Amino acid sequence: ISGKPFGWNLPNWLLRREMVSRIAELPNVDFRPGVGFDRMLARDAEAIVTLTEGTQISVRLVIGADGRGSAVRKAADIDVKTKRYGQKALTFAVTHDAPHENVSTEVHCSGGPFTLVPLPDHEGRPCSAVVWMNDGTKIANLAALDPASFDAAATARSGGIYGPLTCVSKRGTWPIISQIASAMNGPRAALVAEAAHVMPPIGAQGLNMSLADLACLLDL
């Protein structure tokens, strides 16, 4: 309405690059890529955490930011309520003839939305990421199509707004669920991001909520 962008789409690789770069600048951070949380013992003054490579560390607070299947949440004995919608999302990237002008587009019809998110050009052609939602059986059938049939189905579902679509990536499928933890904290533990709550992707608010969780935790 104001003419200003409603939001910005940032690729995961860019976010990871910038976060890793920032982490490298922080003297109080011990970054251990490839090492995960195994278990913890909560005490009055500390938590003893055992990592997947066998080492133990003593910390004042364990922050569970380890996703919807959070091991930290389970170790803190925090229950979770999950709602399943019987839908899945099919994700992939396409090239097309018409430029996307850096605008995301959603095409709605029965079964679920078909969302095109602008990406940088691929081999000189306009490129978009796609999130295609439908019931689980339909998505499984689409994921199994041969390339030509899949491109034709994606083009038809898009309404042809960018012209013929050509898939240029692997196809991934994701279950559509919502999830909420029964508590956001436990003994010497706190939950953020998808360890605490999961939303369907249609609102595109998962990252924003995760960042808000971190801001809230810092303010406590």
PLM region descriptions:
Residues 46-56, 61-171, 176:
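Conserved FAD-binding catalytic core of PHBH/FMO-like flavoproteins
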Residues 11, 33, 133-135, 195:
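A secondary-structure boundary/capping signal
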Residues 8-13, 144, 208-211:
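Short, solvent-exposed loop/helix junctions and linker helices
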Residues 1-75, 83-88:
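Conserved N-terminal helical subregion
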Residues 172-220:
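Conserved mid-domain beta->alpha element of the FAD-binding
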Residues 4, 139-140, 198-201:
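Short small-residue beta-strand/loop micro-motif enriched in glycine and branched aliphatics
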Residues 43, 110, 185-186:
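Structural motif
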